[in-house]
Amino acid sequence: MPRLLLIETSTSLCSTALAEDGRIICSRRSTEPRAHASLTAVFVKEMLEESGWTVRELDAVAVSAGPGSYTGLRVGSSTAKGLCFGGQVPLIAVSTLDILARQAIEAGLPEGCKAILPMVDARRMEVYTAVNSPEGARLTDISPVILDENSFADLFASGPVAVIGDAAEKFAPLRATAASPWRTCPPPDPGRGRGPSEMGGAVVSAANEVPPEAGCGCANGSVFMQCCPEASAMLVPAMRKYEKKEFEDTAYFEPFYLKQFIATTPKKLF
């Protein structure tokens, strides 16, 4: 089985992991603000020393392809590309939304789940999102969306949905307004011995919008997981790409930065 280095820097969480034989053997993470540039390379160095590997002994380097913050993605992609050039190993790019979808699967989907809705915060009520199947397959293109009470109404009407990402907490109250009561679940824990507080995630709380006693389940059992993407959750989608030899052109690879937001909500004509 291949040896993979996994780098995830698309949001406020900076995380890295090493995998062998389809399992994570070591990882590093930090939620320290604006520390991606100073920590990513350090984390990689520490893990390689811990494992006893060299960069040339890696079979591939996988990095988050976005969408995400410009600074974080730039740090992650430049680190990954430098390692690939220096070690002469291939580069794998994994969508941030696909990483989140995998985290939802590892955390546990609601019974009868119809879809996974990963979301990356783009400030205000703006998000980047896509619809994934309960198995994690992408069903729609990544697109910018301005959230309101009617967002994805048809999707929620079809059955339980798992919403995950650093924008889940701002979408949950909108769905609670549209279909109260609702419930939340803990963020995923793909690492070894890490609890929710150490994950950089949090249970979405209805305390500010809907009192907890309002109910123990959304009208259709949907759940909302507030968390950031983790490097360890990249393993499964990265392995799929590795097996298919879906490698990037290292010299020309650029991640999907959060650019100027152009999504709009329809205006009333009368």
Locate predicted features.
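Conserved hydrophobic/aromatic positions in well-ordered beta-strands
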Residues: 17, 128-132, 256
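Residues at secondary-structure transition points
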Residues: 31-39, 70, 74, 78, ...
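Acyltransferase
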Residues: 224-270
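Surface "functional belts" at beta-alpha junctions
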Residues: 23, 90-189, 198-229, 262-263, ...
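DPxDG-like acidic metal-binding loop motif
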Residues: 62-96
